Amino acid sequence: MRLIRMLLATALTFSMIPAHADSKDVARLTQLLEKSQTLTARFSQLTLDGGGTQLQETTGEMALQRPGLFNWHTDAPQEQLMVSDGKKVSLWDPDLEQVTIKKLDQRLTQTPALLLSGDVSKISESFDITAKEAGGVIDFTLKPKTKDTLFDSLRLSFRNGIINDMQLIDSVGQRTNILFTGVKANESIAASKFQFQIPKGADVIQE
């Protein structure tokens, strides 16, 4: 649930070459993000507290499509489903038989999932961006320019031009690490993947 809400609200062994935040870093990150109009992958997510103690570990699958469409399904036993049709987000909790529906916040600092599925053409207006590169791996660190966010730092890592993992760090040092596997880019995804059908008998909360 924590990962879902952060997405909503939102050490390499090689010697890395640091790159100062400049227009080249911004342009490179924007290009890498925008070249994938669709993405599908499995993910594994690990949450650690500020001292490094494991708090939660989950797995699941995701599908993304620009602009602003995503389907993020966490496996049982902590099953959750988050679906965006580009205008609203539906969060389904099968254990509670409850769906929460809210308007999609288009701000990248409030909805990190949009970094992979939304409009990132003005990403530098929301974040200070720095990059480090080693071989075929590029790490981008994004720090929000405003304090009204659910995370203090976000790292996106690309391997051979494809998203490999991401990490979010909140104000108390809690880390959420997400590793993507079996990533497929720019393949057709059924439109129904981004339409949530409310189950019969479910409690519905509109926010």
From Swiss-Prot:
Source species, domain of life: Bacteria
Localisation per UniProt entry: Periplasm
Keywords assigned: Chaperone, Periplasm, Protein transport, Signal, Transport
Major localization listed first in the record, in broad terms: periplasm
GO terms under cellular component: outer membrane-bounded periplasmic space
GO biological process: lipoprotein localization to outer membrane; lipoprotein transport
Signal peptide: 1-23
One Pfam family in the UniProt entry: LolA
Entries under InterPro entries matching the protein: LolA/LolB/LppX (IPR029046), OM_lipoprot_carrier_LolA-like (IPR004564), OM_lipoprot_carrier_LolA_Pbac (IPR018323)
Family note: Belongs to the LolA family.
Subunit structure and binding partners: Monomer.
Record-linked NCBIfam families: lolA (TIGR00547)
Task performed by this protein: Participates in the translocation of lipoproteins from the inner membrane to the outer membrane. Only forms a complex with a lipoprotein if the residue after the N-terminal Cys is not an aspartate (The Asp acts as a targeting signal to indicate that the lipoprotein should stay in the inner membrane).
Protein name, UniProt field: Outer-membrane lipoprotein carrier protein
Species for this entry: Pseudomonas syringae pv. syringae (strain B728a)
Gene it is expressed from: lolA
